[in-house]
UniProtKB/Swiss-Prot annotation:
Function summary: Putative nuclear shuttle protein.
Identification of the protein by name: Putative nuclear shuttle protein
Record key words, sorted: Host cytoplasm, Host nucleus
Keyword Amino-acid biosynthesis: no
Cellular component terms per the entry's GO annotation: host cell cytoplasm; host cell nucleus
Taxonomy, superkingdom: Viruses
Homology family: Belongs to the nanoviridae nuclear shuttle protein family.
Transmembrane segments: none
Signal peptide: none
Subcellular location(s) of the protein: Host nucleus; Host cytoplasm
Length: 153
């Protein structure tokens, strides 16, 4: 891994907006290095990490909400597997808005095969929200995801 430290660092950023958390919502995102036809030689890509932060709100009285934000990745065999979970939730005593927020970084260190200069590095991710108690149409969530990538020619 030490040979990657001198490689340029690039990020891929996404925002997933869930205006309602009813029905275990999910969104697909694509991590891409956007280096197609920008280099003269083939390259390797190291997907270093996936940083996730979120904030959201819920409404109600005497309300306990909780669930999990799951980040999954489609691996080379085509199977979508979770890379990690971040708990979400809160409690509210009276009729008002409650808020929740959180963040976590998942270290991946996944090295690609050599890519031709005329192809992009792509990796599909799935962002899912799982209801454990009370997450519904009166709850929302905005998720910010930053993938850190290193590129080696």
């Amino acid at each position: 891994m030490a040979d990657w430290f001198s490689s340029p660092l690039k990020t891929c950023t996404h925002v997933c907006d869930f205006p309602s958390l009813a029905g275990d919502p999910q969104q697909e995102i694509m991590c891409c290095d956007s280096m197609k036809n920008k280099l003269q030689d083939s390259r390797k890509v190291l997907l270093v990490s996936c940083s996730v932060s979120f904030n959201g709100s819920f409404y109600g009285g005497n309300r306990n909400v909780r669930g999990q934000l799951q980040i999954s990745m489609v691996e080379d065999d085509g199977v979508c597997r979770p890379i990690g979970y971040v708990p979400i939730g809160g409690y509210l005593y009276h009729n008002d808005y409650g808020y929740y927020e959180g963040a976590r970084t998942f270290n991946l260190d996944l090295e690609s095969q050599y890519l031709k200069k005329d192809e992009d590095y792509n990796r599909k991710f799935l962002v899912s929200v799982f209801n454990e108690n009370g997450l519904d149409s009166q709850c929302d969530l905005k998720v910010f995801i930053v993938h850190s990538i290193r590129i080696k020619v």
